[in-house]
Amino acid sequence: MKYSTIFSAAAAVFAGSAAAVGVSGSAEGFAEGVTGGGDATPVYPDTIDELVSYLGDDEARVIVLTKTFDFTDSEGTTTGTGCAPWGTASACQVAIDQDDWCENYEPDAPSVSVEYYNAGVLGITVTSNKSLIGEGSSGAIKGKGLRIVSGAENIIIQNIAVTDINPKYVWGGDAITLDDCDLVWIDHVTTARIGRQHYVLGTSADNRVSLTNNYIDGVSDYSATCDGYHYWGIYLDGDADLVTMKGNYIYHTSGRSPKVQDNTLLHCVNNYFYDISGHAFEIGEGGYVLAEGNVFQNVDTVLETYEGAAFTVPSTTAGEVCSTYLGRDCVINGFGCSGTFSEDSTSFLSDFEGKNIASASAYTSVASRVVANAGQGNL
Protein backbone atom coordinates (compact mmCIF):
# COMPACT_ATOMS: atom_id res chain seq x y z
CA MET A 1 0.00 0.00 0.00
CA LYS A 2 2.82 2.36 0.91
CA TYR A 3 4.59 1.80 -2.42
CA SER A 4 1.30 2.17 -4.28
CA THR A 5 0.66 5.49 -2.57
CA ILE A 6 4.14 6.77 -3.40
CA PHE A 7 3.78 5.67 -7.03
CA SER A 8 0.36 7.30 -7.33
CA ALA A 9 1.66 10.54 -5.90
CA ALA A 10 4.64 10.56 -8.27
CA ALA A 11 2.38 9.83 -11.22
CA ALA A 12 0.11 12.68 -10.22
CA VAL A 13 3.05 15.08 -10.04
CA PHE A 14 4.27 13.95 -13.47
CA ALA A 15 0.80 14.28 -14.97
CA GLY A 16 0.43 17.76 -13.54
CA SER A 17 3.82 18.77 -14.95
CA ALA A 18 2.98 17.37 -18.38
CA ALA A 19 -0.38 19.12 -18.36
CA ALA A 20 1.37 22.42 -17.66
CA VAL A 21 3.47 22.16 -20.82
CA GLY A 22 1.84 23.82 -23.76
CA VAL A 23 1.28 26.97 -25.73
CA SER A 24 1.02 30.20 -23.77
CA GLY A 25 -1.86 32.49 -24.70
CA SER A 26 -3.59 32.56 -28.07
CA ALA A 27 -2.97 34.09 -31.45
CA GLU A 28 -4.11 37.60 -32.23
CA GLY A 29 -4.81 38.92 -35.68
CA PHE A 30 -5.29 36.96 -38.88
CA ALA A 31 -4.23 33.60 -37.39
CA GLU A 32 -6.69 33.83 -34.51
CA GLY A 33 -8.14 30.39 -33.81
CA VAL A 34 -4.99 28.38 -34.57
CA THR A 35 -4.58 25.41 -32.22
CA GLY A 36 -1.41 23.69 -33.44
CA GLY A 37 -1.00 20.31 -31.78
CA GLY A 38 -3.87 21.03 -29.42
CA ASP A 39 -3.93 18.82 -26.34
CA ALA A 40 -1.64 16.11 -27.72
CA THR A 41 0.70 14.59 -25.14
CA PRO A 42 3.97 16.57 -25.24
CA VAL A 43 7.03 14.90 -26.73
CA TYR A 44 10.62 15.83 -25.93
CA PRO A 45 13.06 15.12 -28.76
CA ASP A 46 16.59 14.26 -27.70
CA THR A 47 18.38 14.12 -31.06
CA ILE A 48 18.18 16.09 -34.27
CA ASP A 49 16.76 13.03 -36.03
CA GLU A 50 13.95 12.78 -33.49
CA LEU A 51 13.17 16.47 -33.88
CA VAL A 52 13.00 16.20 -37.68
CA SER A 53 10.76 13.13 -37.39
CA TYR A 54 8.33 14.73 -34.95
CA LEU A 55 8.05 17.93 -36.99
CA GLY A 56 7.46 16.10 -40.26
CA ASP A 57 5.09 13.27 -39.39
CA ASP A 58 1.32 13.05 -39.82
CA GLU A 59 0.43 13.23 -36.12
CA ALA A 60 -0.87 16.21 -34.18
CA ARG A 61 2.00 17.01 -31.82
CA VAL A 62 3.16 19.30 -29.05
CA ILE A 63 6.95 19.25 -29.39
CA VAL A 64 8.96 20.70 -26.51
CA LEU A 65 12.57 21.80 -26.92
CA THR A 66 14.66 21.74 -23.75
CA LYS A 67 18.10 22.35 -25.27
CA THR A 68 19.92 23.48 -28.40
CA PHE A 69 19.64 21.19 -31.43
CA ASP A 70 22.75 21.90 -33.47
CA PHE A 71 22.41 20.93 -37.14
CA THR A 72 25.41 22.94 -38.30
CA ASP A 73 27.69 20.16 -39.55
CA SER A 74 25.07 17.42 -39.73
CA GLU A 75 25.03 17.32 -43.54
CA GLY A 76 28.64 18.20 -44.29
CA THR A 77 29.96 21.15 -46.26
CA THR A 78 30.20 22.29 -49.86
CA THR A 79 33.07 24.22 -51.40
CA GLY A 80 32.80 26.06 -54.66
CA THR A 81 32.85 29.42 -56.39
CA GLY A 82 30.43 32.20 -55.53
CA CYS A 83 30.48 35.95 -56.03
CA ALA A 84 30.92 39.17 -54.06
CA PRO A 85 28.34 41.70 -55.31
CA TRP A 86 28.71 43.88 -52.21
CA GLY A 87 32.49 43.93 -52.03
CA THR A 88 35.28 41.79 -50.69
CA ALA A 89 35.86 43.51 -47.35
CA SER A 90 35.84 41.22 -44.33
CA ALA A 91 32.41 42.43 -43.14
CA CYS A 92 30.68 41.86 -46.49
CA GLN A 93 28.45 38.89 -47.18
CA VAL A 94 29.20 36.90 -50.30
CA ALA A 95 26.75 34.89 -52.38
CA ILE A 96 26.50 31.20 -53.08
CA ASP A 97 25.96 30.66 -56.80
CA GLN A 98 22.58 29.03 -56.30
CA ASP A 99 20.85 28.27 -59.60
CA ASP A 100 23.48 30.35 -61.43
CA TRP A 101 22.43 33.44 -59.49
CA CYS A 102 25.83 35.08 -59.86
CA GLU A 103 25.86 34.69 -63.66
CA ASN A 104 22.24 35.74 -64.10
CA TYR A 105 21.99 38.64 -61.67
CA GLU A 106 25.51 39.77 -60.77
CA PRO A 107 27.67 39.01 -63.82
CA ASP A 108 30.11 41.80 -63.02
CA ALA A 109 30.70 40.77 -59.41
CA PRO A 110 34.11 39.31 -58.61
CA SER A 111 34.27 35.55 -58.09
CA VAL A 112 35.18 34.24 -54.64
CA SER A 113 35.68 30.86 -53.02
CA VAL A 114 32.85 29.72 -50.75
CA GLU A 115 32.52 26.96 -48.18
CA TYR A 116 29.20 26.58 -46.43
CA TYR A 117 27.27 24.09 -44.33
CA ASN A 118 24.75 22.09 -46.35
CA ALA A 119 22.30 21.79 -43.45
CA GLY A 120 21.51 25.49 -43.53
CA VAL A 121 20.43 25.72 -47.15
CA LEU A 122 17.05 24.02 -46.69
CA GLY A 123 15.03 24.13 -43.48
CA ILE A 124 13.25 21.37 -41.55
CA THR A 125 9.79 20.59 -42.90
CA VAL A 126 6.97 21.29 -40.43
CA THR A 127 3.68 19.56 -41.23
CA SER A 128 0.14 20.33 -40.13
CA ASN A 129 -1.18 20.40 -36.57
CA LYS A 130 2.08 21.02 -34.76
CA SER A 131 3.02 23.12 -31.74
CA LEU A 132 6.77 23.64 -31.42
CA ILE A 133 7.56 25.30 -28.11
CA GLY A 134 10.66 26.00 -26.08
CA GLU A 135 11.06 25.43 -22.37
CA GLY A 136 12.22 28.59 -20.61
CA SER A 137 15.13 30.06 -22.56
CA SER A 138 16.70 26.76 -23.53
CA GLY A 139 14.97 25.60 -26.71
CA ALA A 140 16.94 26.46 -29.84
CA ILE A 141 17.63 25.25 -33.36
CA LYS A 142 21.10 26.13 -34.63
CA GLY A 143 22.39 25.89 -38.17
CA LYS A 144 19.07 25.09 -39.85
CA GLY A 145 15.72 26.82 -40.27
CA LEU A 146 12.08 25.77 -40.45
CA ARG A 147 9.88 25.34 -43.55
CA ILE A 148 6.08 25.44 -43.41
CA VAL A 149 5.08 24.67 -46.98
CA SER A 150 3.00 22.60 -49.42
CA GLY A 151 -0.41 23.00 -47.81
CA ALA A 152 0.66 22.76 -44.16
CA GLU A 153 -1.80 24.38 -41.77
CA ASN A 154 -2.61 24.94 -38.11
CA ILE A 155 0.92 25.41 -36.78
CA ILE A 156 2.27 27.25 -33.72
CA ILE A 157 5.93 28.04 -33.11
CA GLN A 158 6.56 29.69 -29.76
CA ASN A 159 9.44 30.58 -27.45
CA ILE A 160 12.38 29.18 -29.41
CA ALA A 161 15.50 30.58 -31.06
CA VAL A 162 16.66 29.90 -34.62
CA THR A 163 20.27 30.97 -35.12
CA ASP A 164 23.58 30.74 -36.96
CA ILE A 165 22.59 29.64 -40.46
CA ASN A 166 25.60 30.26 -42.72
CA PRO A 167 25.66 33.95 -41.74
CA LYS A 168 28.42 34.82 -44.19
CA TYR A 169 26.51 33.57 -47.22
CA VAL A 170 23.52 34.93 -49.08
CA TRP A 171 21.54 31.88 -50.22
CA GLY A 172 22.97 30.10 -47.19
CA GLY A 173 19.52 29.58 -45.73
CA ASP A 174 16.49 31.28 -44.18
CA ALA A 175 15.37 31.07 -40.56
CA ILE A 176 11.63 30.58 -41.16
CA THR A 177 10.03 29.95 -44.55
CA LEU A 178 6.29 29.91 -45.25
CA ASP A 179 4.86 29.03 -48.65
CA ASP A 180 1.40 27.66 -49.46
CA CYS A 181 0.19 27.35 -45.86
CA ASP A 182 -2.59 28.59 -43.59
CA LEU A 183 -3.22 29.39 -39.94
CA VAL A 184 0.35 29.86 -38.73
CA TRP A 185 1.26 31.65 -35.52
CA ILE A 186 4.90 32.45 -34.76
CA ASP A 187 5.33 34.00 -31.33
CA HIS A 188 8.22 34.93 -29.01
CA VAL A 189 10.82 33.58 -31.43
CA THR A 190 14.37 34.97 -31.61
CA THR A 191 16.23 34.81 -34.92
CA ALA A 192 19.89 35.79 -35.21
CA ARG A 193 22.89 35.45 -37.53
CA ILE A 194 21.06 34.22 -40.62
CA GLY A 195 22.48 33.98 -44.14
CA ARG A 196 19.40 35.14 -45.96
CA GLN A 197 15.92 36.04 -44.66
CA HIS A 198 14.87 35.89 -41.03
CA TYR A 199 11.31 35.41 -42.34
CA VAL A 200 10.27 34.74 -45.90
CA LEU A 201 6.75 34.15 -47.17
CA GLY A 202 6.98 32.69 -50.64
CA THR A 203 5.03 33.25 -53.82
CA SER A 204 2.20 30.82 -53.07
CA ALA A 205 -0.66 31.90 -50.81
CA ASP A 206 0.10 31.95 -47.09
CA ASN A 207 -3.45 32.85 -46.08
CA ARG A 208 -3.65 33.61 -42.33
CA VAL A 209 -0.36 34.31 -40.55
CA SER A 210 0.40 36.10 -37.27
CA LEU A 211 3.96 37.09 -36.35
CA THR A 212 3.88 38.38 -32.79
CA ASN A 213 6.37 39.28 -30.07
CA ASN A 214 9.37 38.09 -32.08
CA TYR A 215 12.92 39.43 -31.89
CA ILE A 216 14.62 39.91 -35.24
CA ASP A 217 18.24 40.45 -34.21
CA GLY A 218 20.19 41.87 -37.13
CA VAL A 219 23.60 42.03 -35.47
CA SER A 220 26.06 40.03 -37.58
CA ASP A 221 29.73 39.87 -38.49
CA TYR A 222 28.67 39.80 -42.15
CA SER A 223 26.08 41.77 -44.08
CA ALA A 224 25.17 42.84 -47.60
CA THR A 225 25.77 46.42 -46.47
CA CYS A 226 29.18 45.49 -45.01
CA ASP A 227 28.43 47.32 -41.76
CA GLY A 228 27.26 44.59 -39.37
CA TYR A 229 23.58 45.41 -40.03
CA HIS A 230 21.73 42.49 -41.58
CA TYR A 231 19.89 43.46 -44.76
CA TRP A 232 17.59 40.48 -45.28
CA GLY A 233 14.93 40.89 -42.58
CA ILE A 234 11.33 40.04 -43.49
CA TYR A 235 10.19 39.31 -47.04
CA LEU A 236 6.43 39.01 -47.60
CA ASP A 237 6.03 37.95 -51.22
CA GLY A 238 2.90 35.88 -51.39
CA ASP A 239 -0.34 35.49 -53.26
CA ALA A 240 -3.43 36.49 -51.27
CA ASP A 241 -1.42 36.52 -48.03
CA LEU A 242 -2.89 37.90 -44.81
CA VAL A 243 -0.16 38.80 -42.32
CA THR A 244 -0.37 40.35 -38.88
CA MET A 245 2.84 41.71 -37.37
CA LYS A 246 2.39 42.83 -33.78
CA GLY A 247 4.75 43.43 -30.88
CA ASN A 248 7.90 42.49 -32.80
CA TYR A 249 11.34 43.97 -32.13
CA ILE A 250 13.17 44.64 -35.40
CA TYR A 251 16.71 45.57 -34.43
CA HIS A 252 19.95 46.48 -36.19
CA THR A 253 18.89 45.74 -39.75
CA SER A 254 19.60 47.67 -42.94
CA GLY A 255 16.73 46.71 -45.26
CA ARG A 256 13.71 44.54 -46.01
CA SER A 257 12.23 45.07 -42.59
CA PRO A 258 9.77 44.28 -44.10
CA LYS A 259 9.56 44.06 -47.88
CA VAL A 260 5.91 43.60 -48.91
CA GLN A 261 4.53 42.85 -52.37
CA ASP A 262 2.46 40.60 -54.66
CA ASN A 263 -1.04 40.70 -53.18
CA THR A 264 -0.02 40.70 -49.52
CA LEU A 265 -2.22 42.45 -46.96
CA LEU A 266 -0.10 43.40 -43.94
CA HIS A 267 -1.35 44.76 -40.63
CA CYS A 268 1.75 46.13 -38.91
CA VAL A 269 0.83 47.24 -35.40
CA ASN A 270 2.72 48.13 -32.22
CA ASN A 271 6.13 46.97 -33.44
CA TYR A 272 9.43 48.57 -32.42
CA PHE A 273 11.91 49.35 -35.19
CA TYR A 274 15.24 50.35 -33.68
CA ASP A 275 18.67 51.16 -35.06
CA ILE A 276 18.11 50.53 -38.76
CA SER A 277 20.96 51.89 -40.84
CA GLY A 278 19.18 51.73 -44.19
CA HIS A 279 15.44 51.37 -44.69
CA ALA A 280 12.62 49.59 -42.92
CA PHE A 281 9.74 49.24 -45.40
CA GLU A 282 9.77 48.40 -49.07
CA ILE A 283 6.25 48.24 -50.48
CA GLY A 284 6.27 46.78 -53.95
CA GLU A 285 3.43 46.39 -56.42
CA GLY A 286 0.59 44.44 -54.82
CA GLY A 287 1.71 45.21 -51.28
CA TYR A 288 -1.01 46.67 -49.05
CA VAL A 289 0.10 47.91 -45.64
CA LEU A 290 -1.77 49.30 -42.66
CA ALA A 291 0.88 50.55 -40.22
CA GLU A 292 -0.31 51.89 -36.87
CA GLY A 293 0.99 52.37 -33.36
CA ASN A 294 4.56 51.46 -34.31
CA VAL A 295 7.71 53.17 -33.05
CA PHE A 296 10.61 54.00 -35.37
CA GLN A 297 13.71 54.97 -33.43
CA ASN A 298 17.01 55.71 -35.18
CA VAL A 299 15.67 54.48 -38.52
CA ASP A 300 17.37 56.26 -41.41
CA THR A 301 14.61 55.67 -43.98
CA VAL A 302 11.24 54.36 -42.86
CA LEU A 303 9.92 53.76 -46.39
CA GLU A 304 12.11 53.31 -49.44
CA THR A 305 10.33 51.72 -52.41
CA TYR A 306 6.63 52.60 -52.65
CA GLU A 307 4.76 50.98 -55.52
CA GLY A 308 1.82 49.46 -53.65
CA ALA A 309 -0.53 51.12 -51.18
CA ALA A 310 -0.22 52.07 -47.53
CA PHE A 311 -2.16 53.82 -44.83
CA THR A 312 0.21 54.99 -42.11
CA VAL A 313 -2.28 57.08 -40.10
CA PRO A 314 -0.77 60.50 -40.78
CA SER A 315 -2.94 62.10 -38.08
CA THR A 316 -5.37 61.18 -35.34
CA THR A 317 -8.19 62.60 -37.42
CA ALA A 318 -7.11 60.57 -40.43
CA GLY A 319 -7.23 57.43 -38.28
CA GLU A 320 -10.97 57.79 -37.81
CA VAL A 321 -11.55 56.26 -41.24
CA CYS A 322 -10.57 52.86 -39.83
CA SER A 323 -13.74 52.66 -37.75
CA THR A 324 -15.69 51.79 -40.88
CA TYR A 325 -13.51 48.78 -41.69
CA LEU A 326 -11.84 47.68 -38.45
CA GLY A 327 -14.55 48.69 -36.00
CA ARG A 328 -12.19 51.17 -34.29
CA ASP A 329 -10.00 54.15 -35.07
CA CYS A 330 -6.41 53.54 -36.10
CA VAL A 331 -3.63 55.07 -34.01
CA ILE A 332 -0.68 57.17 -35.11
CA ASN A 333 2.92 55.97 -35.27
CA GLY A 334 5.83 57.45 -33.32
CA PHE A 335 9.23 58.58 -34.61
CA GLY A 336 12.47 59.45 -32.82
CA CYS A 337 15.70 60.52 -34.57
CA SER A 338 14.15 58.87 -37.57
CA GLY A 339 12.69 59.37 -40.97
CA THR A 340 8.90 59.38 -41.21
CA PHE A 341 6.14 58.28 -43.52
CA SER A 342 2.68 59.70 -44.09
CA GLU A 343 1.01 57.58 -46.75
CA ASP A 344 -2.74 58.04 -46.83
CA SER A 345 -4.15 55.45 -49.23
CA THR A 346 -7.39 54.03 -47.83
CA SER A 347 -8.77 52.21 -50.86
CA PHE A 348 -7.65 48.80 -49.57
CA LEU A 349 -8.93 49.12 -46.01
CA SER A 350 -12.15 47.38 -47.01
CA ASP A 351 -10.05 44.20 -47.30
CA PHE A 352 -9.92 44.11 -43.48
CA GLU A 353 -13.69 43.83 -43.14
CA GLY A 354 -14.88 40.56 -41.62
CA LYS A 355 -11.39 39.40 -40.65
CA ASN A 356 -9.74 38.92 -37.26
CA ILE A 357 -7.99 42.20 -36.52
CA ALA A 358 -5.34 42.76 -33.86
CA SER A 359 -5.96 45.47 -31.30
CA ALA A 360 -3.76 48.57 -31.19
CA SER A 361 -2.44 50.66 -28.31
CA ALA A 362 -0.87 54.12 -28.36
CA TYR A 363 2.72 54.17 -29.58
CA THR A 364 3.92 55.87 -26.39
CA SER A 365 4.10 52.57 -24.47
CA VAL A 366 5.32 50.37 -27.31
CA ALA A 367 9.12 50.60 -27.11
CA SER A 368 9.50 49.64 -23.46
CA ARG A 369 6.88 46.91 -23.68
CA VAL A 370 8.33 45.32 -26.79
CA VAL A 371 11.92 45.33 -25.51
CA ALA A 372 10.77 43.65 -22.29
CA ASN A 373 8.55 41.05 -23.95
CA ALA A 374 9.79 40.18 -27.44
CA GLY A 375 11.74 37.06 -28.24
CA GLN A 376 12.54 33.77 -26.59
CA GLY A 377 12.32 33.54 -22.81
CA ASN A 378 9.88 36.43 -22.41
CA LEU A 379 6.51 34.70 -22.28
UniProtKB/Swiss-Prot annotation:
List the Gene Ontology MF annotations in alphabetical order. pectate lyase activity; pectin lyase activity
The entry's comment on post-translational modification says: N-glycosylated at Asn-129 and O-glycosylated at Thr-88 when expressed in Aspergillus nidulans. The protein from strain 4M-147 is O-glycosylated at Thr-88 and Ser-368. PubMed:9195887 modeled GalNAc at the O-glycosylation site, a glycosylation not observed in fungi. The O-linked saccharide is probably mannose.
**Active-site residues per Swiss-Prot or TrEMBL entry:** R256
According to the record, glycans are attached at T88, N129, S368
Q: What GO cellular-component annotations does this UniProt entry give?
A: extracellular region
Q: Which GO biological process entries does UniProt record here?
A: cell wall organization; polysaccharide catabolic process
Report the leader peptide range. 1-20
SUPFAM superfamilies, alphabetized: Pectin lyase-like
Q: What class of enzyme is it?
A: lyase
- Cross-referenced InterPro entries, in alphabetical order? Pec_lyase, Pectin_lyas_fold, Pectin_lyase_fold/virulence, PEL
Q: What is its main location?
A: secreted
Location relative to the cell: Secreted
The intrachain disulfides are C83-C102, C92-C226, C322-C330
Consequence of mutating F273W? In strain: 4M-147
Catalyses:
Eliminative cleavage of (1->4)-alpha-D-galacturonan methyl ester to give oligosaccharides with 4-deoxy-6-O-methyl-alpha-D-galact-4-enuronosyl groups at their non-reducing ends
**Phenotypic consequence of T316S:** In strain: 4M-147
* Key word Protease present: no
What is this enzyme's EC?
Answer: 4.2.2.10
- Which key words tag this protein in UniProt? Carbohydrate metabolism, Cell wall biogenesis/degradation, Disulfide bond, Glycoprotein, Lyase, Polysaccharide degradation, Secreted, Signal
Membership in a protein family: Belongs to the polysaccharide lyase 1 family.
Q: What does this protein do?
A: Pectinolytic enzymes consist of four classes of enzymes: pectin lyase, polygalacturonase, pectin methylesterase and rhamnogalacturonase. Among pectinolytic enzymes, pectin lyase is the most important in depolymerization of pectin, since it cleaves internal glycosidic bonds of highly methylated pectins.
Q: What is this protein called?
A: Pectin lyase A
Native organism: Aspergillus niger
Write the gene name. pelA
